[in-house]
Design a protein with these regions (language model features):
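Short, hydrophobic/amphipathic alpha-helical patches that form generic packing surfaces
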Residues: 66-77, 140, 242, 342-349, ...
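Short pre-active-site segment immediately N-terminal to the catalytic Zn-binding motif
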Residues: 456-478
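C-terminal, non-catalytic "cap/extension" segments appended to globular domains
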Residues: 2-29, 33, 193-194, 369, ...
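Active-site-proximal, well-structured secondary-structure segments within enzyme catalytic domains
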Residues: 130, 134, 163-169, 173, ...
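C-terminal non-catalytic alpha-helical accessory regions
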Residues: 35-126, 559-571, 575-592, 599, ...
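His/Asp/Glu-rich acidic catalytic environments and adjacent acidic regulatory segments
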Residues: 2-33, 80, 87-297, 396-399, ...
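Amphipathic alpha-helical coiled-coil segments
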Residues: 38, 42-45, 61, 68, ...
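Membrane-entry segments of alpha-helical transmembrane domains in multi-pass membrane proteins
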Residues: 19-31, 53-58, 259-263, 302-309, ...
Length: 694
């Protein structure tokens, strides 16, 4: 095992992470070394001082925390994108140590007292606003971390944090393992009628890789979803739907082999731990705890917001479903729509109504044109240039870029676009390094990870074919890049509130959802399309059809997101984990009250709902819709500017950069939004953009 700190690549902070050298054996020595140093810093800072200042207290604590956080961030990232037994073991060995340290700091009464003393000192008023906000956030976090609890309760609180981290990790691992384990082989090509050629080619390649005949499908989204959307064989759609809807549950395909992959018990454990944590802190429920650092005032406000949105969307959703049911019966011979019919029937209905298909559109979005078009838009909006750069990466398909303005480096990012075994599903942005101005006056620029799970390029007859993106995948890429811009274009020099740091969780989706809107602009799309076979730009007539179909089934889609948000809130607000009611009953009650499309009784989507059980969205999934109000209203400012000409659009872009992206978490999100928009947010733009305006 590598124990020499001087030779451990995970401890090299001189530049970018050395992904070409870091292995699982480096993790424990590096984390132990950094924890030892961090505990020593904390011990030194506990000692009484004549005066508490930023420089003699906050800065050294941030220095130690940042190095530990950066190293652990690399480990966590690798665990998400190149899962191996060795790396997983190293991660699980060290996660409890990290949790223990975080809790020890959060409950340290001496540190807490010093933050409060600094807040009350005469020197506080002389600090710049970003530093004041960091101090206020720290005091809040100490209180929420149990610093004010009596000793016995502190001990229990710490145990809760450690167990919660372990169970949450186990939840994620179960989803990943169940996803990777499932393989469906189809040997008769006739069973794949309706499936696009590129989906069949990918399935053929997977079968060959696994040494199997025919075509093989997995539960990775680019593999299974084309079956639900395009396969004519209803039984095949049902098979794949059941497998995906029951993964990591007692009803899953793999349950007979690995009962420990069932997340049902983990969900209950997590809810119990969160409820106990809330009670220890003096709150009625975990939803109240979750909302302390957010824009929303209380759970009642969130529930009222969601129920109001459901009320507005329901008439449109009912109309959507009635039309789909009639079409399925009359045109497809499906008398009773089932869950595995809805994507298929919806695709057929959209083709019939708007005379185009998602597969037709996909041919115009080869990866290189989409990425180039995205970069072109960013350059135009924010006066920056994006260029390829070099850095060690964790996989051969990962690319690295730099963002500059007037020759000055602003930030860098890794782009990891393709789905693969050992990589967690979904799409996300995370920070590898935050912007910070050091005590020596040297600026540390931000670095981001941008991760998606799109279909990798296919090799046909020895020739590599470009990866083609669906329009939904284009939107996903723009979404994640919006997060990346928030992180990389910040001008705040204090680590705790630069970029995405310190931004309220229900506002952090504003920049990401804002970027999605550009995926519907002709001037943007016309520069990022080229037909895979002919090279032709997206025809204006096809674009017009896409635009006409933009709000296709928006009522159903809105209700689906509201359903997820409400069940998340109710599980953390008025559900009693030790009571007679089960998690499934709560979900069923929410669906009965608000849903138009009720999933089958065997559906266990919650068993892979990583956002709230293995991510940061517990009692916070509503943030997507909450922030969509902000992002739609922000984009409406650009729509208004377009009517006034290019100069107005340019000025609006500069104002958005100045008031939203640049300031990061250095001030409240509502203050930033109001500075940009000139008023508080309105839901009107969201309803209009969704085709649900009154």
């Amino acid at each position: 095992m590598t124990t020499d700190a001087s030779n451990n690549p995970l401890l090299d902070f001189s530049g970018l992470p050395r992904f070409d050298a870091i292995t699982a054996e480096h993790v424990t020595p590096a984390i132990d070394h950094l924890l030892e140093k961090s505990y020593a810093v904390v011990a030194a800072l506990e000692a009484p001082t004549a005066e508490v200042t930023w420089d003699n207290f906050v800065a050294p604590l941030e220095d130690a925390s940042e190095l530990l956080g950066r190293a652990w961030g690399v480990v966590s990232h690798l665990n998400n994108v190149v899962d191996t037994p060795e790396l997983r073991a190293a991660y699980n060995e060290n996660q409890p140590k990290m949790t223990e340290f975080g809790t020890a700091v959060a409950q340290n009464e001496a540190l807490f007292a010093k933050y409060k003393a600094l807040r009350a000192s005469a020197g506080f008023d002389a600090l710049e606003p970003a530093r004041k906000r960091i101090i206020d956030n720290a005091i809040r976090d100490f209180r929420m971390g149990g610093a004010e609890l009596p000793a016995e309760q502190k001990e229990r609180f710490a145990a809760i944090q450690e167990e919660h981290a372990a169970v949450s990790t186990r939840f994620s691992e179960n989803v990943l393992d169940a996803t990777n384990d499932y393989k469906l082989t189809v040997e008769d090509e006739a069973d794949l009628a309706g499936l696009p050629d590129d989906a069949k080619q990918a399935a053929k390649a997977l079968a060959e890789k696994e040494g199997k005949p025919g075509w093989m499908f997995s539960l990775h989204f680019p593999s299974y979803y084309p079956i639900l959307q395009f396969a004519d064989k209803r039984a095949l759609r049902e098979t794949v739907y059941r497998a995906n809807a029951t993964k990591a549950s007692d009803l899953g395909e793999v349950f007979s082999k690995r009962e420990d992959w069932d997340n049902t018990g983990n969900i209950v454990t997590l809810l119990k731990l969160r409820d106990e944590e809330a009670k220890l802190l003096g709150y009625k429920n975990f939803a109240e705890v979750s909302l302390v650092p957010k824009m929303a005032k209380d759970p009642e406000q969130v529930i009222a917001f969601l129920e109001d949105l459901a009320r507005r969307a329901r008439p449109y959703a009912e109309q959507d479903y009635a039309e789909l049911s009639t079409f399925a019966k009359d045109e497809l011979g499906i008398d009773q729509l089932q869950a595995w019919d809805i994507p298929y029937a919806s695709e057929k209905l959209q083709e019939a109504r708007y005379a185009f298909s998602a597969q037709e559109v996909k041919q115009y979005f080869p990866e290189h044109k989409v990425v180039d078009g995205l970069f072109r838009l960013i350059s135009s909006l924010f006066s920056v240039t994006i260029a390829p750069d070099t850095a060690p990466a964790w996989h051969k398909d990962v690319r690295f870029f730099r963002i500059e303005r007037d020759g000055k480096l602003l930030g860098q990012f890794y782009l990891d676009l393709y789905a693969r075994a050992g990589k967690s599903g979904g799409a996300w942005m995370d920070d590898a390094r935050g912007r910070r101005l050091g005590a020596n006056g040297q600026l540390q620029t931000p670095v981001a990870y941008l991760t998606c799970n799109f279909t990798e390029p296919a090799v046909i007859d020895g020739k590599v074919q470009p990866s083609l993106f669906t329009h939904d995948e284009v939107i996903t890429l723009f979404h994640e890049f919006g997060h990346g811009l928030h992180h990389m274009l910040t001008q705040v020099n204090e680590l705790g509130v630069s970029g995405i740091s310190g931004v309220e969780w229900d506002a952090v989706e504003l920049p990401s959802q804002f970027m999605e809107n550009f995926c519907w602009e002709w001037e943007v799309l016309s520069h990022m399309t080229a037909h895979a076979a002919t090279g032709a730009t997206l025809p204006r007539a096809l674009y017009d059809k896409m635009l006409a179909a933009k709000n296709f089934q928006s009522g159903m889609q809105t209700l689906r997101q509201v359903e997820f948000s409400l069940l998340d809130m109710h599980l953390h607000y008025d559900f009693q984990p030790d009571g007679a009611k089960t998690v499934q009953q709560v979900i069923d009650e929410v669906r009965a009250k608000f849903s138009i499309v009720i999933p089958p009784a065997f559906n266990r989507f919650q068993n892979s709902f990583g956002h709230i059980f293995a991510g940061g969205y517990a009692a916070g999934y509503y943030s997507y819709k909450w922030a969509e109000v902000l992002s739609a209203d922000a984009y409406a400012a650009f729509e208004e500017a377009q009517a006034l000409g290019e100069d107005a659009v340019s000025e609006t872009g500069k104002r958005y950069l100045r008031e939203i992206l640049s300031v990061g978490g250095s001030r409240p999100a509502l203050e930033s939004f109001t500075a940009f928009r000139g008023r508080e947010p309105s839901i009107d733009a969201l309803l209009r953009h969704s085709g649900m305006a009154a």
